[in-house]
UniProtKB/Swiss-Prot annotation:
This protein is involved in the repair of mismatches in DNA. It is required for dam-dependent methyl-directed DNA mismatch repair. May act as a 'molecular matchmaker', a protein that promotes the formation of a stable complex between two or more DNA-binding proteins in an ATP-dependent manner without itself being part of a final effector complex. One of its GO terms (biological process) is mismatch repair. InterPro entries: DNA_mismatch_repair_CS, DNA_mismatch_repair_MutL, DNA_mismatch_S5_2-like, HATPase_C_sf, MutL/Mlh/PMS, MutL/Mlh/Pms-like, MutL_C, MutL_C_dimsub. Keywords: DNA damage, DNA repair. PROSITE patterns: DNA_MISMATCH_REPAIR_1. It comes from the Bacteria. It comes from Lactococcus lactis subsp. cremoris (strain SK11). CDD domains: HATPase_MutL-MLH-PMS-like, MutL_Trans. Residues 387-410 have a biased composition (Polar residues). Belongs to the DNA mismatch repair MutL/HexB family. SUPFAM superfamilies: ATPase domain of HSP90 chaperone/DNA topoisomerase II/histidine kinase (SSF55874), DNA mismatch repair protein MutL (SSF118116), Ribosomal protein S5 domain 2-like (SSF54211). Residues 385-427 are annotated as: Disordered. This is DNA mismatch repair protein MutL.
């Protein structure tokens, strides 16, 4: 007797459901796409328990005829293609005829539908893919499909379901993408009876962007357009100042279908060129109309992977359109607009400084672990300009990003005289005047870490410190060196977060898309480890009323956004990695940059601090802080050491 058997239809549908119905969001996607294909102008999605208990999709589309309702639950039954030729000119979102039977096989499904041609509607009830009831229904134009108790008959699938908040976030993301793809349709998402998202459906894509990402984001989006013989490109991209740490905010649409394509993502970044910082990604919504013959959507059951003909030409079109859009306007960030994230604007009076920092050597304050212009230079400028007060502007000082009022001389004096509590722990008890360095202790640490005993010679290009020792010549990157010093300080500091808080006179507001808001609402307690306490405030917003004393107020907004990005982009949150990323970020931003001259005294102080580090050889991002040219290397460069012909001949003899 043969061993091969034909599986029954119910089992075959459950197997197919493994590909089509991965999670509740997959059900929402398939049902809403069917509603879009039915010509709906209004679609409402209601969920309970993140879709596991109930998913209900209601539309005002064409509806189904009575004889088609039962047939819709048969595998490979569809109204969207009729022959193989149709497979290569698909304009609908669905075409396989697998979604409804697959969903019905792992749930309890109810379909209520009617169309304009029939006097009454039809109601179908199915359980596990088996039709139990098929009866007439009072007429209501459109269709309502309810999916209850998802995966009730496949409990093993429930083991792989994440938290309800995570599943709800995926559902919200699906609705967000479909709303961006079809601004002409009004979408409403309801969770547990509460409205989560609503779009106007008036065809204005920018209004949809505002509904999803917030008005502030929509204001910073630039419209793009482009076309050639094969493609028509429209959409919006964000100004370079508005970025995130991952690609989740890039939406690419092919004929109204959300797709994922690495090369098209790369084309978007190429369009920005060097306007974007490394590791940052823009907001983008690109809608591409293409001849269906040039796109093969029959690649994967989810239909998110699409093979494109003339892909390189499309990449060029995208890059060119973005570059032209960003080149047309002024890209200087609006300072006042960027302050709108505050609940109240601070009223401050600042005076523009005339201090040419680039031309004045900086000195290193070991207590503050930072670089400052010498007081004599400031007093000289004060004397020459007859100015009573100037605003200190030191771009290398992490604590000063916005102008401050008051006398510069007073501020510098305060900084050099006062002992900052922040750095007390890193300042050796037995300090030498001027630098506060315990040379005996440093020597021991240097020996333990095998860090060379360096003699400072000069500064090269206002960026590198030229040093020597008995082992040869050394070049030290001043930015990487201080970044390593500050990284080790901040890593310890963040690991021992003080609960001391500074109340903000003007609290900060952080607006997120609904799907990100859901995730952060679940994980915001993780920020407590860093002394950051966010409260839910209004729709899709968090408010920060106070900040930890270790976080400077001038960097609050940027730093908190970086923390949020880390949490949202990490599938598994690691406090250790989080502290590393945060410490690396703060250290990099607050360290002295290239092209800043240092005097010899300050350069030596920086080298001594570097020698005390646990790992003085690389910065927090892995770049080397120091490179070495041995005596032999230098002699070889000047051909003082040469290999003889005899030695080469001997080496060839070894191979015989």
């Amino acid at each position: 007797m043969g061993k091969i058997i034909e599986l029954n239809e119910a089992l075959a549908n459950q197997i197919a459901a493994g590909e089509v119905v991965e999670r509740p969001a997959s059900v929402v996607k398939e049902l809403v796409e069917n509603s879009i294909d039915a010509g709906s102008s209004k679609i409402t999605v209601s969920v309970e328990e993140a879709g596991l208990r109930l998913i209900e999709v209601t539309d005002n589309g064409l509806g189904l005829e009575k004889e088609d309702v039962a047939l819709a639950l048969r595998r490979h039954a569809t109204s969207k293609i009729k022959d193989s030729a149709d497979l290569f000119r698909i304009r609908t979102l669905g075409f396989r005829g697998e979604a409804l039977p697959s969903i019905a096989s792992v749930s309890q499904m109810t379909i209520e539908t009617s169309n304009a041609q029939e006097e009454a509607g039809t109601k179908l009830i199915a359980k596990g893919g088996t039709i139990e009831t098929l009866e007439p229904l009072a007429k209501r134009l459109g269709t309502k499909i309810s999916v209850a108790n998802l995966f009730y008959n496949t409990p093993a699938r429930l083991k792989y379901i994440k938290s309800l908040q995570a599943e709800l976030s995926h559902i919200t993301d699906i609705i967000n993408r479909l709303s961006l793809a079809h601004p002409e349709i009004s979408f409403t998402l309801v969770n547990e009876g509460k409205e989560f998202l609503k779009t106007a459906g008036n065809g204005d894509l920018r209004q949809v962007i505002a509904a999803i990402y917030g008005i502030g984001t929509a204001k910073k989006m630039r419209e793009i357009n482009g076309s050639d013989l094969d493609f028509e490109l429209t959409g919006y991209v964000s100004l370079p100042e508005l970025t995130r740490a991952n690609r989740n905010y890039i939406t690419i649409l092919i004929n109204g279908r959300f797709i994922k394509n690495f090369l098209l993502n790369r084309a978007i970044l190429e369009g920005y060129g060097n306007r974007l910082m490394v590791g940052r990604f823009p907001f983008a919504v690109l809608s591409i109309k293409i001849d269906p013959k040039l796109a093969d959507v029959n690649v994967h059951p989810t239909k998110q992977e699409v093979r494109l003909s003339k892909e390189r030409e499309l990449m060029t079109l995208i890059s060119k359109a973005i570059d032209e859009a960003l080149s047309e306007g002024v890209l200087i960030p609006e300072a006042l607009e960027n302050l709108q994230g505050r609940v109240k604007e601070k009223e401050t009076v600042s005076v523009q400084t005339e201090l040419p920092l680039q031309n004045n050597p900086l000195y290193y304050d070991n207590v503050r672990q930072d670089f400052f212009v010498r007081e004599e230079a400031i007093f000289e400028i004060n004397k020459n300009d007859n100015s009573d007060s100037l605003t200190e502007q030191n771009s290398t000082d992490y604590t000063v990003n916005q102008p401050e009022t008051g006398s510069v001389s007073e501020k510098i004096t305060d900084r050099t005289v006062e002992s900052s509590n922040e750095f007390t722990d890193r300042t050796p008890k037995n300090s030498v005047s001027n630098f506060g360095v315990d040379f005996d202790n440093i020597e021991k640490l240097s020996q333990q870490s095998t860090f060379p005993q360096l003699e400072y010679l000069a500064q090269l290009h206002a960026t590198y410190l030229l040093c020597q020792s008995k082992e040869g010549l050394y070049l030290v990157d001043q930015h990487a060196a201080q970044e390593r010093i500050k990284y080790e300080y901040w890593k310890d500091k963040i690991g021992e977060v003080s609960m001391e808080q500074q109340i903000l006179l003007a609290p900060y507001l952080f607006t997120l898309p609904k799907n990100d808001f859901i995730v952060l609402a679940e994980k915001k307690d993780l920020l407590h480890e860093a002394g950051v306490f966010l409260e839910e405030y209004g729709e899709n917003q968090f408010i920060l009323r106070e900040h930890p004393i270790w976080l400077k107020e001038t960097e609050i907004e940027k730093s908190i956004n970086e923390m949020i990005d880390i949490i949202l982009s990490s599938k598994e949150f690691s406090l250790k990695k989080y502290r590393h990323d945060l410490a690396a970020m703060v250290a990099c931003k607050s360290s002295i940059k290239a092209n800043h001259p240092l005097d010899a005294e300050s350069a030596r102080a920086l080298l001594r601090e570097l020698a005390t580090c646990k790992n003085p050889y690389s910065c927090a991002h892995g770049r080397p802080t120091i490179v070495h040219f041995s005596g032999d290397d230098i002699q070889k460069m000047f051909r003082r050491i040469q290999e003889t012909h005899r030695s080469k001949a001997a080496s060839w003899k070894d191979f015989e």
